[in-house]
Amino acid sequence: MSQGSRAPFVVAHRGASAARPEHTLAAYELALQEGADGVECDVRLTRDGHLVCVHDRTVDRTSSGSGLVSEMTLEELRVLDFGADGSPASVLTLSELISLVLDWRSRPTKLFIETKHPVRYGALVENKLLAELQRFGIATPASADHSRAVVMSFAATAVWRIRRAAPLLPTVLLGESSRYLGGSAATTVGATAVGPSVKTLRDHPELVDKAAAAGRATYCWTVDDPGDVQLCADLGVSWIATNHPGRTKALLPAA
């Protein structure tokens, strides 16, 4: 592990999403039970201004309904089933997920929140997100290391908005281009970490050292193969997002 003495922290990608429907309360509860160090979610804004944990622009793939998240109210989303295999599940709001994470008393767990762009609401997504973090008292941590929330986006402007409004909140600039992540973009927007895909990291392992030299951590997604878990550990990746948090934790040495 070239960048530090400890193994990567394990982040449950959309919860324990290999075993439970993604972005459901059941998926996140299982991830926490399996010992995930962090949980990840994507957020989108409903027509009536609520942040919900949904990856796609539409609800077609993950629910019993169809349509754009941005054109539906929270009440309309609530009547859809986001579960599977006879276990119904309601849409999860960011507020509900934050409450779950903060109330989990066995250990502190970080929440990695990805804002999706381009969207019709633009900067309102980040504004609403910051308001929600402020409501829970986690928008202004004492330091980045002690932050309970990390904000991520593929959109550099979204990262910049967060850094400008809440400079102590850690941020991750996501991407699949080594040139983009290894260039000046992260510096320009003030990202505290870069987030390459595992494929990008396989092809360009030097990204980790390059980020570290600039004082940035590395967040790698989505790491499910045991060989890739070992690669991330060997390179010194800080955080790995996985659909299998329990299995991935078992592959790594204990902290």
Label for each model-derived stretch:
Residues 1-255:
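Phosphate-group recognition and catalysis centered on beta-loop-alpha active-site segments
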